[in-house]
Curated annotation (Swiss-Prot):
<feature type="modified residue" description="4-aspartylphosphate">
    <location>
        <position position="65"/>
    </location>
</feature>
<keyword id="KW-0238">DNA-binding</keyword>
<dbReference type="Pfam" id="PF00072">
    <property type="entry name" value="Response_reg"/>
</dbReference>
<comment type="similarity">
    <text>Belongs to the ARR family. Type-B subfamily.</text>
</comment>
<feature type="DNA-binding region" description="Myb-like GARP">
    <location>
        <begin position="169"/>
        <end position="223"/>
    </location>
</feature>
<keyword id="KW-0597">Phosphoprotein</keyword>
<dbReference type="GO" id="GO:0005634">
    <property type="term" value="C:nucleus"/>
</dbReference>
<keyword id="KW-0805">Transcription regulation</keyword>
<dbReference type="InterPro" id="IPR045279">
    <property type="entry name" value="ARR-like"/>
</dbReference>
<keyword id="KW-0010">Activator</keyword>
<feature type="compositionally biased region" description="Polar residues">
    <location>
        <begin position="228"/>
        <end position="245"/>
    </location>
</feature>
<protein>
    <recommendedName>
        <fullName>Two-component response regulator ORR28</fullName>
    </recommendedName>
</protein>
<dbReference type="GO" id="GO:0003677">
    <property type="term" value="F:DNA binding"/>
</dbReference>
<comment type="function">
    <text>Transcriptional activator that binds specific DNA sequence. Functions as a response regulator involved in His-to-Asp phosphorelay signal transduction system. Phosphorylation of the Asp residue in the receiver domain activates the ability of the protein to promote the transcription of target genes. May directly activate some type-A response regulators in response to cytokinins.</text>
</comment>
<feature type="region of interest" description="Disordered">
    <location>
        <begin position="225"/>
        <end position="245"/>
    </location>
</feature>
<keyword id="KW-0804">Transcription</keyword>
<keyword id="KW-0932">Cytokinin signaling pathway</keyword>
Amino acid sequence: MAQNEGIPNGTLSAMVIDEDKCHADSTCSMICTQLNFCVTVFTSPIKALDFLQNQAEGVHLVLADVQMEEMNGFEFLKVARELHKSIQVIMMSTETTIYTMKRCVQLGAQILVKKPLDVVTIQNLWQHLDIKVLKMEKIKDMLQGVGDKSTCANEMNSFPENQKDGTKRKYYLMWTPHLQKKFLHALEILGEGQISLMIMDVDNIDRKQISTHLQKHRLQLKKKLSKASFTKGSNEDTSNPSAKNHLTCRTMTLQPHPYTNQPAETTMQIHSEDVEHDDVYDAMRRALQDGTAFDESKYSSDPFSNEDEDVVGDGYADKANAIDSSGDHYQVAVVLTTPHNVDYTQEIMNKVTTSDDVQVTRGGKATVSRLVDYSDSDSD
């Protein structure tokens, strides 16, 4: 049997579902007296579900028994929550075990209370209810009879759900990877000038948020480009062989020939970038053997003649600068420069002085010593 089936507008309503009619009636009277709720009592859970299916929006609180023969209380709770998701259900049971409490909470119940209910329990029921939902439901019921229904509905929908103390809460947009992918896709289609909301096809996003994110995107691109250019420049400096000028200096001391009467000591330093042609080798060898200067202008057709070549001295030493302490020895300086490889320079010098004794000191500079004698009368 159902009591007070007609729920009047403007009041909070409750339902009591219990197969024990005496307990259901006593609970109904205490709720009406203590909480001033309009209560509907059902002894059949099936009829209670039929009532909820037709008038689920008008019920704010449901008290249901767990141990019912016609339908288990857990099944009733599950179906009631499916019919009305915001409905608040309080379960009643003679056994308040941990399992029963956990099961009720998992299915969406507010709390499990022990039967039979007393006045103190009824008075404390409101502490377990969502008062905000109850107030909103009451306001909606009160506004149904005032003004146009469509106007009231629009005003209620415009109210923020999380409104507190009359201040509107500010929401922040989080750019998830999915939103970032849509943003980049729209950027490819339209470019950086404009991004259309229709292309992104995302709700709850405005142009201001898109423009702000576009500015951040441009700043990130600038940082990445500057970092990439700096890294590329540093790699080129370290990997470019021509970035550094490597100088290998060799000093050649020509020792006196054993068959000459008047020995003359000649020191030669050779500067050259890269010489590989056989004609150049032969000319250098002849110049060293004859004690004359090496003229590089005769070999301008050499493929490596574009490199800087510097010959110091003319084969006949200047007396103001080249005469040593003995007064009869001459010095001619020719410096040979090879990039990067000291061993390669050593190979060239070995080809030039194959028939003579060579003494080499390795390090930052290599020194080759050889003495050649020639008479002053031959040079005149």
